[in-house]
Structures are given as structure tokens and as C-alpha cells.
Regions:
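Helix-coil boundary/capping segments in enzymes
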Residues: 1-228
Length: 228
């Protein structure tokens, strides 16, 4: 607990990776692998993050996460999907299967540590009807507190086809968190210039956020869904 008992320090941007979701997106993984030299990496689709062993980090080690939260004076975290596993561009059924497993695992950890964690739900955004059903299941039955999607999927953020989903999220009365897509990586703008100097994070994400906000405002989403 923070020193001021009247307030809490809340971390709203805290990604997590679950063992229960490994290989739940079919051939797209995700999975933790090792190459012939024993170097551990994280694979999703044809992309490899190397070296990366999530099992030895706060992404997967809950005890380590809780220790770090205590060390930094963080009282509560909103846990959210790893943006590498948004899977907004894979076949819909694979995304549906993955998101269901992701949200079930999220609900379980929140239930076990309800004083420390809230959970955000992943959606198979490429299938609007399935996304509405999963959002309702995640909030009404699993007790998750927010909806979490990327900024780059098969249609524009202001496409009217998304209006039923936006209406459903507004009706559920939970926040919609839109995380910038992995610019320069799978499902994001492919600009090789971003690869230099780690500009994917420095400039690419800011670019994605700017485009997303422009589409939400100038595309009329906020006007059509004032309670979103």
C-alpha cells in the first residue's frame, strides 16, 4: 500500500504473457523456442523475438511481478495482453481460440490476486460478431475490467463495421484501451527506416497513436459513440 492510505498508485500499462496461451493460435503460436545454439526466443507467426525468455521475467513470473510492484510502490496493475499477440491479422478462428484462452487465463490471475490486479480482455477484432460475444463474456462472466485492442487491423478504426462493437463496449461501461501496433513488424506499417536506432518504439508507436486518434476524432467515432 502506498504511504498515503487515501490513494493508490495504479499502473495502467502492464503487459503479461500466459503459459496457458502457448500454441493456442494454431500455427501462429505463440511459443517459446530455442535455436540450435540454445538461444531462447519468442515466436508468433513468422516473427521471432530473439533472445527472449519470458519465463524468466515479470511477463510470466507472477511472484517476480509482485516483488517488483512492492519495490516500486505500485498498489494495483491493470494487466493487459502482450501487443505481439494481438493477432489481428490471422484467420478469425485462430484469433477467437487464442483470445478465449488469453481471457480465461487473465481472469484466473485476477481472481487469485484481486487486491493487486485488474484484467483487460483481448478481442478477435477481425470478426466483429465474435468480438462482441467475447467482450460480453469477458466483462459479464469473467469479471475483466477493460477491453484491449491494437491500432492496426484489417479495416480502419472509424469503419462503420466497428460501430456495433463500439456500442457494445459503451453498453458494458468499461474502458477501451487501444495500444499502438508494432510498427515495422507484423500487422504494422513496414518502414525499414524505423529499424535503426530503435525508432520503432520512439517514432513508430507515436505515429500509430496519432493516426488512431485522428481516425477516432475525424472519422466520427467519438461523435457516434459519445459514451465510449
Amino acid at each position: 500500500m502506498s504511504s498515503d492510505e487515501s490513494s493508490k498508485v495504479i499502473d495502467l500499462h502492464a503487459h503479461i504473457v500466459f503459459q496457458e496461451t502457448m500454441n493456442r493460435a494454431g500455427s501462429f503460436g505463440p511459443e517459446v523456442c530455442a535455436d540450435n545454439d540454445g538461444i531462447v526466443f519468442f515466436r508468433f507467426g513468422g516473427y521471432q523475438m530473439k533472445p527472449m525468455d519470458y519465463s524468466k521475467t515479470i511477463f510470466m513470473d507472477v511472484a517476480m511481478r509482485l516483488e517488483e510492484m512492492h519495490r516500486h510502490g505500485i498498489d494495483l496493475q491493470l494487466l493487459s495482453p502482450n501487443p505481439l499477440t494481438f493477432f489481428h491479422h490471422i484467420p478469425a478462428q485462430d484469433a477467437i481460440n487464442f483470445c478465449a484462452a488469453q481471457n480465461d487465463a487473465m481472469a484466473n490471475i485476477v481472481l487469485k490476486h484481486s487486491d493487486k490486479f485488474l484484467g483487460a480482455a483481448a478481442l478477435p477484432i477481425q470478426d466483429i460478431d465474435a468480438s462482441i460475444k467475447e467482450a460480453e463474456r469477458a466483462v459479464k462472466h469473467l469479471g475483466l475490467s477493460a477491453i484491449y485492442i491494437g491500432t492496426n487491423f484489417p479495416f480502419d478504426i472509424d469503419d462503420p463495421c466497428l460501430d456495433p462493437l463500439y456500442s457494445a463496449i459503451a453498453e458494458l461501461n468499461v474502458p477501451l484501451f487501444m495500444h499502438p501496433a508494432s510498427s515495422g513488424g507484423p500487422g504494422g506499417p513496414d518502414d525499414s527506416r524505423l529499424a535503426r536506432f530503435d525508432m520503432t518504439l520512439i517514432l513508430g508507436y507515436a505515429y500509430e497513436e496519432t493516426v488512431a486518434v485522428a481516425q477516432l476524432v475525424l472519422g466520427g467515432v467519438i461523435d457516434r459513440h459519445p459514451n465510449l
